[in-house]
């Protein structure tokens, strides 16, 4: 799945809130402990949740080992969020070959001179980015600070598709 800012509308606060709400409901926001399914003697399924102590012990062990959480994301969840777009985020199953460009280089052909004049200067991308200002891929980052100053965890890998 790929998402690019060229073919999608402007990201509104409502669409971002909707996307975050969907992630929360899917149980993948803020390292939520997943529920596990167990079978009883009569064959019925029950849902068992890990205790907080088990989750905390596992999280501290993972942190000591330098483990970054891996989250499975259903491909259909990402397909539903077509209006989510960012010039700094590309959702794809393939590893990128090179870092994203910092400036838009290709200008679309438009017959309207007024529109062309507005775009004459280089269009700056990522002005309000939540990413570090680096023009290379950062692969060893485990935490970052978002635009509101909150500490967030950077996921090492996101699995898409059936588990």
Swiss-Prot record:
Pfam families: NGF (PF00243), NTF3_N (PF19338). Residues 1-3 form the signal peptide. GO terms for cellular component: axon; dendrite; extracellular space; synaptic vesicle. Residues 4-119 form a propeptide. Keywords: Cleavage on pair of basic residues, Glycoprotein, Growth factor, Secreted, Signal. GO terms for molecular function: growth factor activity; nerve growth factor receptor binding. Gene3D superfamilies: Cystine-knot cytokines (2.10.90.10). Coiled coil: none annotated. It is found in: Secreted. Glycans are attached at residue 112. GO terms for biological process: cell surface receptor protein tyrosine kinase signaling pathway; modulation of chemical synaptic transmission; negative regulation of neuron apoptotic process; nerve development; nerve growth factor signaling pathway; neuron projection morphogenesis. Residues 36-61 are annotated as: Disordered. Seems to promote the survival of visceral and proprioceptive sensory neurons. This is Neurotrophin-3.
């Amino acid at each position: 799945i790929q998402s690019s800012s060229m073919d999608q509308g402007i990201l509104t606060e409502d669409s971002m809130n909707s996307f975050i709400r969907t992630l929360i409901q899917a149980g993948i926001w803020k390292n939520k402990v997943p529920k596990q399914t167990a079978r009883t003697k009569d064959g019925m399924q029950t849902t068992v949740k890990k205790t907080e102590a088990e989750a905390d012990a596992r999280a501290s062990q993972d942190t000591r080992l330098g483990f970054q959480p891996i989250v499975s994301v259903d491909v259909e969840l990402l397909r539903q969020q077509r209006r989510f777009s960012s010039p700094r985020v590309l959702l794809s199953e393939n590893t990128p070959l090179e870092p994203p460009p910092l400036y838009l280089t290709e200008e679309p052909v438009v017959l309207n001179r007024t529109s062309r004049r507005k775009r004459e200067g280089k269009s700056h991308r990522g002005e309000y980015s939540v990413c570090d200002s680096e023009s290379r891929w950062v692969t060893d980052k485990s935490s970052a600070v978002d635009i509101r100053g909150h500490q967030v965890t950077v996921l090492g890998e996101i699995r898409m598709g059936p588990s």
